UniProtKB/Swiss-Prot annotation:
SUPFAM superfamilies: Zn-binding ribosomal proteins
GO molecular-function term, one example from the UniProt record: structural constituent of ribosome
Domain of life from the UniProt record: Eukaryota
HAMAP family named in the record: Ribosomal_bL32 (MF_00340)
Protein name (database record): Large ribosomal subunit protein bL32c
GO biological process: translation
Protein's gene: rpl32
InterPro entries associated with the record: Ribosomal_bL32 (IPR002677), Ribosomal_bL32_plant/cyanobact (IPR044958), Ribosomal_zn-bd (IPR011332)
Family to which the UniProt record says this protein belongs: Belongs to the bacterial ribosomal protein bL32 family.
Cellular component GO terms held in the UniProt record: chloroplast; large ribosomal subunit
Amino acid sequence: MAVPKKRTSKSKTKIRKTTWKKEACESAIKAFSLAKSILSQRSKSFYYSKKNIILPSSFESQSKEEE
């Protein structure tokens, strides 16, 4: 005969949720800082093509003035 499993306690559920949210928040912060470094052209940890990068309008106007 099938027996129902024990229910997970609320504290255990909250602990698991907070760890998941913490990891998600950390990865979001890393992605955001990486995007900021690419847009500000200060990235030193990797190479990227300037032709394929999407720049905000302020950077585009500066690059046109330099030419």
